[in-house]
């Protein structure tokens, strides 16, 4: 395959996401990457041992939800990008359980290979099967077998000597995690690739990486994490002080409350500060003291707060929908699948406003709705909490049934012959100029799923 239109078509077929864009999205959603929140790891003995010793080829960063694993990996990626020797490649992938494009082992390999080929196109010689199979090579029932074979062969190429491979949130790989862990373990033994992976403290991951991985526990390094969280708190309070014009006394008390209750959890600090952004400075101290320590306690408090709002029922429907669908929805897709949002079909900005007001569970990036963090979805779907019955009163299966019925309704009302008004039925899809607005945009989830 030549470096040409043919190669570019191959990349288009291979691409499930561009991990570089995912990294930018994640950092933007979290308010930017603060150097002081990750710099400690660059002097950590386990990390330095992994980076500097060619015989240490797998490092597992593990920790509880909200401890800053993802931003830690973002910082490590930036450091490796800046310091790696010329010619040494780096590839990474961010798993996301709420998006089926980012939560399978095959998607992980497609993302890693995509980045490697972007840097070293000659590696395409390992993908000869594509010439016969086309894009089905990456999508059919044997996709994992094909991709893992291609990937393993690539790692034996001399141009990938000591390549850095990083995967964030292995616990959010919902499909074929066992096979992915086996591949990581095997290639860390049989090739020179240097793996760095992160996850929660899951027994399954511990068991499969036990014999090959060096561990960097965020709980064991609690003092370093706590210091990083304190730096993060200082940054957030400084921002709030400028935004809300806090006096010195208010800023000091806010900082003290955050430091006393954060328990080394970046996410808790971020969520509390997000609430303070929408609170008048006069009520800042009263507001902050209403937030209990701990993520689940915080989420419980926010559910109670939502229940007292005018649009509570609508927001609960939105949460139930987003918690159930197989991928993140756009604003326009959401308006077609929520009964109370049908009147917002031509006004998705109103839905954006509603979600923004109650932002402790959801966030919006480029008109797509995401959970603020996987722990937020876990909380809502945990039947031990009342939130589950509030957003899914009839259960998950019934919610899928409702989505199915609404999809049938919107498809029957929208689809018609030649909806794009093509002049020639034999037009290539690349030649079709989408109308604005796209009549199929709001029903994309419905016609795919």
Descriptions of predicted regions:
Residues 1-412, 416-437:
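Conserved NB-ARC/NACHT P-loop NTPase core of NLR-like innate immune receptors
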Residues 436-449:
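Amphipathic alpha-helices of TPR/Sel1-like and other helical repeat/solenoid scaffolds
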